[in-house]
């Protein structure tokens, strides 16, 4: 043990600096010198080693004696032999220690005399206590000789003083190649790398949309099957696709078009036979330009493009190695089966139901709750193993800590201009152990800088550079170009100079006490307040409206000189319509510094705080309501109260059945009055829109129709109030729903919402395509023919509905039908029974001397008021308002008009009794005689029973009945000459009897007789 310790070389103190000294170069003499100095060391080591070994062997012998017991007791000879053996063993061991190198592996055996042993023993005894330290035998000055160390230090200092260029030169000389490479060191300009006409052409080939990538892979596989050097190689150079807006085409690079045709021959989803597009040389670089993809990092923010989570904010959890897919964490939207349709057919949950749009009606954002999921979908809920987090699997999706963990493709995400709002990001803050939420504002601010748009910085905004080479510069923006902002430095050594900085390195700079306005990106938009604290990218301000502190990002603020007291409080202004609760709205009538004074829909005034307002209702300029008379009222119309104070004003807001109007004559409540729509009438409409009744109906001159040269009837005026089409059963005449029946549920001016019987669905159909039908009989009902025709004669039946009149044959018991057999009504031709009245031709009893007439009998021709022929009414003194009363009345057969029930046959006439003075213009008698159609005679007169038997005399000088053209009887009350008066009893020049204007201008109803008129 002592020998090993003494053999170690601890070195000098100067050797501490270097543990790996370079090997020293020594000569042969130095080796000999070292051998001489080492020899006494070896002898001393051998002696020390022998003593130690002897002591150890003695101990071993004692142990052996104890173990062997009494086997060797008293045997002294054996002990002596063992001692001799020990001495023999120790001697060669002592000599082996002295040899180094290869001699350590060679055994030396030599005979030793006892004399030599005795001499050695004597030497050992003499040298006991005179042992020397190894350093004692070193030459003088050897312990201070550190030349090798100093030389190594000089080499290191020299290497440290060399600069990088010299070190690179030394390394190049030592390790560089001896031969120069055959390369061209000339720099080629990029413009010379652009394609030219000598390069291969690029052809655009039509393919099936969405199959571009598959076609390119098919081309690649075909090239592998027919490589260059084969019997029939593919001669194209490359093929690629661009997708997106350039879908439907693949692009093949080749020398000839024939090579492209050969490469794409008999390949599916591609159409090489169609016209190929040769890409111009100038457009080739744009076609091959690669757009740099957005780098996504865990912790960043993205938005979802489509589906139920469209435009929802999500946080990136993990990015795949290929960069094509990411794992995101977002707040789920679940209804836990509350809105499920139990009657819906069982379908694959992954397949979409037809007509269902999950983005239209989607549940609100809430963290996942296993308690809610267990209520209805317990069988779809399973707990999964997680690393200390609550992990659930619900309906095939994973939820951890209440968040949805979802794998999505990058193309389904919005990675640019995400602009996460602070309230959105707050939902992603995980709660720590002490109950506080830990929100990483640094990563959020970094995302906001990456998505900061150039419109966020306007000229004049105070900004500062917070990172980069220009960090610390303060100035104001002067212009923006893309993501580069030009800044005019206002502080520091560069004051007055203009520099450019990227948007990512800028942030807006505010000081405490600045008055700012929130411009966007936060739910506090349009808030005004004073800055009270600035911390990095977040600014805390005291709102002028709520007197509460709010924290927003500096990019969402802008210096503002506005105040929240002068007529406006933040986002609220006078005359704004606000929502107080689910059933109450109010209009702001006064704005104080910290409160709002509003007039609610019930007419009560209340003072509220801005925080009590649920939301501000955007004014609806297209809102429509109806007043007391059913007239349409809109925003901006002037209305007046019917009852009460009869106040008037301009409509500001329409909310359900309430109107908020502004009365300039009222000073209180800022002139705002709230009334119900049923208590107002329209005074004037905005923009001159007609709202009242059509005044043209009140002008008799405009209502005259039928006379030659007279005005045509005006188009039917717009009706107000409830539409008569509502609730009616209708039939669709044309279109995709032709032939289907339905009920009208709602109408507009030109369209109707019809609930179809067959499909049980609501469709919108134009009104002109609908026909009203009777729900029982299926007959067509005409509800749009105005106010109907004249009254039915007294001797006819009660008026029938508009769709029943004037049909032939018809067995119903009312008038205006031919033939009729069993009715007790008159005015039928021919008829065999009745009330015994005249007016039948031929008639066989009771006043049979009369010519057919549609009304009461005893006419033809007579002087009294009840015997005028022709006339459509049953009154003896009736008169018409038209020049064409004579021919438009009910004395003709056939006729179509709705004047009376005495026409045969007619297709659409009706015997309505609305007004006997309302005649139809331009009656079209059938078979088509001009103005009248005598039966059975022809044009020019209506002799009865025929042209050959005039009554009461011959044709030339007699008075045929009803007369040539017409016999206007009775006359109207002196409205001037009639162009078609029928002179009686002769055809020329005599006074008409009882012609038009027979009564003159008087109104007493008595006949007037002139000279030349025969007496009755």
Swiss-Prot record:
Keyword Transcription carried by entry: yes
Compartments reported by the entry: Nucleus
GO MF: mRNA binding
Comp. bias intervals (Acidic residues): 10-29, 51-88, 110-128
Record-linked InterPro entries: KOW (IPR005824), KOW_Spt5_1 (IPR041973), KOW_Spt5_2 (IPR041975), KOW_Spt5_3 (IPR041976), KOW_Spt5_4 (IPR041977), KOW_Spt5_5 (IPR041978), NGN-domain (IPR005100), NGN-like_dom (IPR006645)
GO cellular component: DSIF complex
GO biological process, one term: transcription elongation by RNA polymerase II
Domain of life: Eukaryota
Family: Belongs to the SPT5 family.
Stated name of the protein: Transcription elongation factor spt5
């Amino acid at each position: 043990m002592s020998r090993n310790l003494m053999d170690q070389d601890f070195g000098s103190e100067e050797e501490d600096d270097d543990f790996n000294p370079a090997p020293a170069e020594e000569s042969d003499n130095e080796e000999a010198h070292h051998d001489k100095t080492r020899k006494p060391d070896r002898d001393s080591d051998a002696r020390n080693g022998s003593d130690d070994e002897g002591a150890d062997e003695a101990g071993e012998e004692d142990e052996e004696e104890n173990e062997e017991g009494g086997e060797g007791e008293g045997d002294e000879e054996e002990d002596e032999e063992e001692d001799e053996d020990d001495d023999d063993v120790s001697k060669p061991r002592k000599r082996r220690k002295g040899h180094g190198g290869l001699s350590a592996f060679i055994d030396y055996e030599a005979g030793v005399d006892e004399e030599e042993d005795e001499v050695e023993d004597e030497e050992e005894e003499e040298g006991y206590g005179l042992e020397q330290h190894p350093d004692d035998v070193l030459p003088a000055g050897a312990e201070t000789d550190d030349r090798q160390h100093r030389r190594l230090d000089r080499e290191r200092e020299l290497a440290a003083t060399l600069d990088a260029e010299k070190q690179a030169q030394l390394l190049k000389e030592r390790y560089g190649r001896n031969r120069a490479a055959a390369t061209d060191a000339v720099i080629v300009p990029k413009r010379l790398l652009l394609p030219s006409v000598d390069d291969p052409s690029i052809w655009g080939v039509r393919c099936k949309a969405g199959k571009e990538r598959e076609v390119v892979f098919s081309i690649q596989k075909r090239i592998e099957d027919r490589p260059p050097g084969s019997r029939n190689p593919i001669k194209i150079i490359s093929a690629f696709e661009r997708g997106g807006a350039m879908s439907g085409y693949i692009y093949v690079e080749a020398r000839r078009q024939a090579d492209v045709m050969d490469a794409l021959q008999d390949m599916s989803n591609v159409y090489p036979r169609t016209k190929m597009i040769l890409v111009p040389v100038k457009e080739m670089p744009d076609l091959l330009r690669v757009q740099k993809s957005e780098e996504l990092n865990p912790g960043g923010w993205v938005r979802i493009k489509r589906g139920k989570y469209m435009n929802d904010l999500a946080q990136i959890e993990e990015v795949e190695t290929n960069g094509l897919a990411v794992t995101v964490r977002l707040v789920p939207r679940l209804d836990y089966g509350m809105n499920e349709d139990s009657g819906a057919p069982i379908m694959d949950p992954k397949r979409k139901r037809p007509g269902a749009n999950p983005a239209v009606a989607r549940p609100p954002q809430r963290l996942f709750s296993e308690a809610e999921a267990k209520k209805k979908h317990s069988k779809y809920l399973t707990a999964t193993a997680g690393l200390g987090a609550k992990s659930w699997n619900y309906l095939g999706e994973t939820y951890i800590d209440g968040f949805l963990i979802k794998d999505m493709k990058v193309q389904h995400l919005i990675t640019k201009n995400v602009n996460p709002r602070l309230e959105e990001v707050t939902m992603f803050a995980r709660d720590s152990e002490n109950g506080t939420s830990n929100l990483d504002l640094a990563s959020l601010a970094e995302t906001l800088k990456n998505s900061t748009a150039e419109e966020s910085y306007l000229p004049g905004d105070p900004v500062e550079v917070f990172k980069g080479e220009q960090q610390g510069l303060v100035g104001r923006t002067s212009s923006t170009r893309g993501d580069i902002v030009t800044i005019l430095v206002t502080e520091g050594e560069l004051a007055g100079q203009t520099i450019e900085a990227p948007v990512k390195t800028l942030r807006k700079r505010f000081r405490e006490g600045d008055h700012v306005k929130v411009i966007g990106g936060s739910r506090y938009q349009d808030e005004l307040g004073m800055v009270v604290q600035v911390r990095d990218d977040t600014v805390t301000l005291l709102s002028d409206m709520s007197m509460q502190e709010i924290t927003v990002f500096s990019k969402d603020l802008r210096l503002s000189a506005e105040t929240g007291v002068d007529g406006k409080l933040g986002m609220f202004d006078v005359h704004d319509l606000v929502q107080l609760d689910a059933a109450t709205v109010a209009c702001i009538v006064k704005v104080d510094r910290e409160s709002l004074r509003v007039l609610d829909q019930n007419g009560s005034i209340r003072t509220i705080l801005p925080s009590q307002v649920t939301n501000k209702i955007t004014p609806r300029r297209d809102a429509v309501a109806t007043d007391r008379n059913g007239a349409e009222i809109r925003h901006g119309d002037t209305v007046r109260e019917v009852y009460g104070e009869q106040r008037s004003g301009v409509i500001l807001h329409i909310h359900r059945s309430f109107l908020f109007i502004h009365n300039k004559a009222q000073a209180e409540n800022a002139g705002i009055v709230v009334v119900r729509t049923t208590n107002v009438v329209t005074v004037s409409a905005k923009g001159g829109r007609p709202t009242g009744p059509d005044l043209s109906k009140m002008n008799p001159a405009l209502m005259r129709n039928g006379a030659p040269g007279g005005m045509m009837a005006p188009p039917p005026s717009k009706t107000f109030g409830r539409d008569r089409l509502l609730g009616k059963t209708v039939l669709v005449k044309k279109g995709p729903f032709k032939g289907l029946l339905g009920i009208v549920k709602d109408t507009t001016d030109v369209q109707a919402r019809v609930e179809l019987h067959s499909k049980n669905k609501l469709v919108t159909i134009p009104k002109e395509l609908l026909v009203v039908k009777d729900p029982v009989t299926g007959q067509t009902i005409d509800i749009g023919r105005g106010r109907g025709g004249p009254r039915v004669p007294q001797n006819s039946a009660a008026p029938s509905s508009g769709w029943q009149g004037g049909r032939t044959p018809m067995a119903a018991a009312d008038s205006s039908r031919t033939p009729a057999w069993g009715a007790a009504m008159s005015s039928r031709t021919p008829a065999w029974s009745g009330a015994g009245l005249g007016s039948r031709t031929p008639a066989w009893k009771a006043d049979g001397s009369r010519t057919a007439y549609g009304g009461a009998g005893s006419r033809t021709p007579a002087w009294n008021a009840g015997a005028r022929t022709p006339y459509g009414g049953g009154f003896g003194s009736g008169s018409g308002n038209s020049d064409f009363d004579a021919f438009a009345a009910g004395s003709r057969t056939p006729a179509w008009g709705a004047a009376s029930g005495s026409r045969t046959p007619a297709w659409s006439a009706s015997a309505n009794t609305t007004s006997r003075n309302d005649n139809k213009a331009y009656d079209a008698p059938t078979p088509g005689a001009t103005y009248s159609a005598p039966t059975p005679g022809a044009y020019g007169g209506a002799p009865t029973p025929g042209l050959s038997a005039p009554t009461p005399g011959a044709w030339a000088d007699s008075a045929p009945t009803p007369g040539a053209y017409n016999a206007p009887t009775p006359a109207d009350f002196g409205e001037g000459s009639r162009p078609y008066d029928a002179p009686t009893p002769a055809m020329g020049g005599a006074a008409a009897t009882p012609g038009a204007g027979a009564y003159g201008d008087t109104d007493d109803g008595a006949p007037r007789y002139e000279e030349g008129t025969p007496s009755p």
